[in-house]
Amino acid sequence: MRMKWLPAGIGLFLVGMSVVSFADGRVYEQAEFPHEICGTWTDIHGGRTLEIAPRAVDGDILDGMYDVAGGGVKGAVKAVLLHEGQSVTEKIGWNVMSPNYQILVYGSQPYYRLTGRHFESVDGIYLGMEMEEVRQLYGEPDHKGGTFPYLNWSYEKEGVSVYFYGGIVDGIWINKGSRKTFDRSGLNADSPRDSYAAYYKAGGPMNEFFTAGEDESEYISLYEDRVCLGSGPY
C-alpha cells in the first residue's frame, strides 16, 4: 500500500501529523478531516444522517488516515476510527466543489447536501440531479460503465453521456454531431468557441474553459469530439 503524497497547498487537513507503520502501509496520526466536509450529511431519503467533526465520525474518534488522495473540496482517504475500543477502517470520498450539490461516500453509503439549484442543463438533466430522475427523463442507457461511486451512462441516439458520483449527476457530455444542446444557451459540441465566449465567462490562465451561473460554479470544457459540463474543468 503506497501513500499518495499531495501537492503543495492541498491536503491541509494533515495537520500536526506523525507517520507510523500500519497494515503494511503508512498512517498519518493526529490528522483532521477538512473543514469542507465537517457537519451533518443526509442520505437520499433523509432517513439516515452522518455527523463529521474534525477528528471524529458519529462520535468515533479519528485515530489516523492513509491512502490519502486530493483534499479540501475533493478527495478520498481511508480513516482509522476507534469504535467501542476497536480500530475500524472506513474509506471516505467526497466532492464538495459545488455550492449547489455536495456528495460524500462513507464506505458504500452515499450522503448528500443538495439544494436543487443549477444554471445549465441538457434536456432538463442538470448537475446535482439524482440518478433515478435521469432514468425517468431518458430511460435506460445504451451503455453503463464505471465502478461505484463513479458511474456513467451513455445514450447513443441522443449523443449524450451522463457521469455520476455517488448516484448524483456530476458531469454531462454532449458528443460531436448530437442535436442536443444546453438548455439556456442553445449551444452544443458543434457550436463555435466564439459563441461560448459570447454567452459564458472564460476562465483559466489560457481561457481554456468557461464558467456558468451567477456563482460561476459550473464549468464547460470544449474538445474536438465533445463539450463537457461539470463542477470543475475537465
Regions found by a protein language model. Give the residues of each.
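Amphipathic/hydrophobic helical signal segments and adjacent flexible N-terminal regions
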Residues: M3-P7, G11-C38, S108
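N-terminal helix-cap/turn-to-beta initiation motif at the start of protein domains
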Residues: F22-T42, A53, D123-L127, M131-E132
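Beta-sheet ligand-binding and adhesion/scaffold domains
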Residues: G25-E32, I44-G47, K78-G116, E214-L222
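Short, solvent-exposed coil/turn segments at beta-strand boundaries
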Residues: H35-C38, E51-D58, V73-K74, N95-Q102, ...
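N-terminal glycine/threonine-rich, aromatic-flanked beta-hairpin/loop signature
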Residues: D43-V88, W173-I174
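Short beta-strand-to-coil "C-cap" segments at the C-terminal boundary of structured domains/repeats
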Residues: P54-R55, Y111-G116, G230-Y234
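Short, recurring structural edge motifs at helix starts
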Residues: H118-G124, K180-S185
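A cross-family detector of function-defining hotspots
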Residues: M129-K180, S185-Y234
